[in-house]
């Protein structure tokens, strides 16, 4: 009994220590955000939480992919992995009229291997830890599209940092691969090597990865021109509060009370 009491006290101490640590992290993050220069954009970025939002994201994908892969774009629709646990869809929308301006899908390996792992065998150093893969990037054309793209890249980093991701993995076609290279992502395989990817229509892609925990330091040391924009500017228009993307209806029963009707909940 004494051992159980000691174990219980130890567990309470550990849990209390963890909760205290989380509170400290939240306070530290709030303090850092308060010191950043605020900047407003003519659009917002959020995690989609309803089917009509997902349709907006697909609309952007079709337009964006249609510029380079029209036949592929025509067949694009909501994909099963859009609703997978551990996956979020970012959606950029105009503040003026709510029109969709950009989107990106982020899948983590919390519940299942990344999509890229169905196409290639990742090296040992990239197999362990928490991983995230960004796919289905699409933005509107013109100047606004370029700004939206940079904000989506920033949102990707912030989300990975928020979720304590160790490595971000990217599969990119040319010439988008050079943009990730400019953001200090590095080749996972051969230098600038393109590999057909089964999970994205067997199109040749370059596989790159970025270590989340050292990104700030690396960008600062490299005097990256976007360092201030990404790390020292607060964009309140980015809302990365968690949302559940699994929209299927789930029947939940209560065996102890058979007289209570089953209720369908959206997951």
Predicted regions and their residues:
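Short, solvent-exposed loop/turn elements at beta->coil junctions and helix N-caps
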Residues: 74-81, 193-198
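Conserved beta-strand in the GNAT
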Residues: 91, 98-108, 116
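Structured alpha-helical
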Residues: 100, 106, 163, 230, ...
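Short, small/polar residue-rich loop motifs at catalytic or cofactor-binding pockets
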Residues: 84-87
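Conserved N-terminal entry element of GNAT/NAT acetyltransferase domains
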Residues: 2-51
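Acyl-donor binding region in acyl/amide transferases
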Residues: 112, 117-214
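Short amphipathic alpha-helix that is part of the acyltransferase structural core
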Residues: 30-79, 89-93
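Charge-rich, low-complexity intrinsically disordered segments
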Residues: 201-267
